[in-house]
Amino acid sequence: MRNPWLWTILLLGLGACNAQQSALHVFGAEARQVREMAILLTIGAAIILSIMILIYVRALRAPEGALSHHGGMRIILWLGAIGPALILGALLLYALPAMRPRDTAPGDLTIRVEGEQFWWRVAYGASRAGPGLVSANEIRLPVGRTVILELGAQDVIHSFWIPGLAGKMDMIPGRTNRLVVRAEKAGRFRGVCAEFCGLSHALMAFDVIAMNPADFDAWLADARGASRGLGSSRGQSLFDAHGCGACHAIRGTAHDAAIGPDLSRFGQRRTLGAGILPPTTANIAAFIRAPQIAKPGARMPAYPQLSEQEAIAIAHYLEGLK
């Protein structure tokens, strides 16, 4: 191996080539337009670069005095200014229609998403089918339907980005930005915060689950009800006794606080802590006792007074909320 550093860099680059968070593996119309524009812009930039290289090579190879002043100026004018301007103008005309927002209708599903340090509050708007619904760190969408995402923030500026669905949009405290999307295929995808927002910025992801319309309607109707798994368990008693309900809501109980993530249907979620850990019993118990270890800067206080067995009991209770 003549150049180990080159191979090391190449291998590190290959390690980042996966489809988990890629703007090239799309499942939405908006992301498809972004991908097509990116490809065309890359081609246009390559053409302009090639023209400039040709001018440079032509000038190097020409004998001294072979190009007159006026001849050289014409080459520079046409190939160095007019040509690139025409290419860039054509690319701009192509991109303008894609900047127009998608049309919406009064009956379209509206989902409010708010970025907080360091998690996501998700609220499905009320409709004729039923009341609103609050969740956290997971967004479910019906395939083939237009969805209006109303984006805001509670603390600092965040940036909402689902690479495979649409472009980035800032989430600004005190302001609501709208992003209209339409998923084209079912599946589970990843979204992230794309703007530095604090210590755990890199630990702030969320799941996007695109579902067949019938499955989505059934899920939404079921999720509006009380969480299954409620009862007189030891974990629920500990949850109540240690004041967890002062920050977290669970539908079907007296807890309706809105400071921290809503824990209703927690047992259905695929990740813990906004996409950073698998929701195993051990991880949930450890997060309850010392959340700052997994997520520095999180506002949830530690509970060192809980024994390991007590934390595990609360974890079992949360796992049963489905």
For the regions a language model picked out, list residue spans one by one.
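Membrane-embedded alpha-helical segments of integral membrane proteins
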Residues: V26-P63
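N-terminal secretory/membrane targeting signals
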Residues: M1-A19
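Short, solvent-exposed mixed-charge patches
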Residues: L321-K322
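Hydrophobic alpha-helical transmembrane segments
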Residues: W5, A38, T42-I43, L77-W78
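Non-transmembrane, membrane-proximal soluble domains of secreted or membrane proteins
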Residues: N18-E36, P63-A258, G275-P296, A302-H316
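Hydrophobic alpha-helical transmembrane segments of multi-pass integral membrane proteins
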Residues: L11-G13, T42-Y56, A81-L91
